[in-house]
Amino acid sequence: AGVSSSAGLPDWNTLLNSLLVSMLSQENFGGPHGDPVKVSEIVARLMEVDGPSTLMLARYIRKGLAVGSPVEQQGFVDAITHQLYSLRDKKFPVESELISSIAKLCTPTRTGANVKSILTYNFDDFIERALLSRSLVHKSVFEEFETPSAEELPVYHVHGFLPEDRQRYSNLDRCTLVFSEEGYHQIYRDAYHWSNLVQLNSFKESSCLMIGLSLTDPNLRRLLEIASKSIEEPKHFAFMRRLTSKKFMAGASGKPLKISNAVVERFLERHHATNEELMRELGVSVIWYEEYGDIPEILNKIRAG
């Protein structure tokens, strides 16, 4: 979810598990009334003993919902949209501090616009809402025939667009939704797919600041590598979280490592240096942060110059 998780939207695994629970509940796997608690237990056990990759799980869900006809396809899109927004943790504001700092960065200054475009891999419309609240003229682009004017800041949804209020947008039926494995395969195979061209053009012609991206997407890495062949020095920047020795020693399970702090520090120094070199090969320089709350502060400093 990246940036969107700061506004309380579910991460990918939570969204997929919820869709799977919803699908099985409709088929009465939890008993005659489709008890969601029982279904959740079934799903949890499935993930435990035979957990597929997230892309395979998404394909499994799409197949389970029998998406074939246009009506079924729309039902599938509606199901994803409903789960995406209904699972939002309401204790977080829709315009989080991070989203707000991104919108501020897009606000033109006396010398002109600092941001040429936004490329998002998320389905939601939270960036658009933040731009709208600031009366910033923009255009959501989610299919190849949409062309923003010179006055509009383009917001490219290269993996698809699922706004909460679909009535505000037209031609959403022409949107390519990269949700499951076959969607990735389609874009990977088609070098001239509009989303590939938009990304490649941005990587070649602009300096990109990557926020909330793990940079593990094979297609994204492929496009960055292609673009990097025409530059001598990295011109893009990506936020990456630096591991501290304290967190590394504690681990996710909370069981501390019985290794000296000096050894861990030396390993992490090499680990971070290696990651920096790997990113340099893709034309990307790393901006390290330790806590997620650091990112808005850094963005505000960039805006202030």
Ranges and model annotations:
Residues G2-A7, W12-N13, S18, S22-R45, ...:
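SIR2/sirtuin-family catalytic core signature
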Residues L87-E95, E182-A191, V263-R266:
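Short, flexible loop segments at the rims of nucleotide/cofactor-binding pockets, characterized by
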Residues E95-L98, Y192-N196, L220:
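Amphipathic coiled-coil/heptad-repeat helices and related helical stalk/stem segments
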